Amino acid sequence: MLGAHGMREKNVFYEESSHVPLMIKMPHEIKKKTTVNGYVSNVDLFATIMDYLNVGNYKSDGESLRDLIEQKQTNHGNYVVTEWDYRGPIQPNYMIVKDGWKLMIPYTEDSKVLNVLYNLNEDPHEMTNLLGKNPNRKKYKKKAEKLRLKLLEWLKKNNSKHYDGVSKRKLI
């Protein structure tokens, strides 16, 4: 992070750390200078490689990006989730980004860590937390709850042990 947000580490959910370019080179398969914009994740890499190698019957939590890369598909997903479970509930453990909005939340109901909501369309440098100590935070409760519901859907799909903590967490 090199000092952004007063931090020098990479294990946080700010854009400088979590929004990184994904570059794939596969001669004779992927056209040079192909650019794809959208929500993708590292978890999709394995499935993409296996797809390009024509390996069938593999298990993966991700989905192949091949149709997106080859422009047979225009939208891979409408949100992305990132999780961090190294230090416990002393920092946000989950991040969900959807439609230019980002929610960061710990996985326990009683963590002292502030919930964080950013409108990346208006605040791309994430300088104003719309939740936390913001006096106007109630105005953003509906948006935060919508993001949390999408996160809970993802947690359930992935059989996360943190589903209950995230669902019981007070947002405002």
Cite the ranges covered by each PLM segment.
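C-terminal cap/loop subdomain of S1 sulfatases and analogous C-terminal strand-loop tails that border
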Residues: 1-4, 43-46, 51-116, 158-163, ...
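Active-site rim elements
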Residues: 9, 29-40, 52-56, 115, ...
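A short aromatic-rich beta-strand->coil structural motif
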Residues: 22-23, 49, 97-138, 147
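Short, hydrophobic secondary-structure boundary micro-motifs
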Residues: 32-34, 61, 77-78, 127-130, ...
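Acidic-residue sensor for enzyme active/binding pockets
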Residues: 15-16, 83, 126
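Long, internal low-complexity/basic segments
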Residues: 19, 41, 130-172
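Histidine-centered active-site microenvironments of extracellular/periplasmic hydrolases
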Residues: 1-32, 41
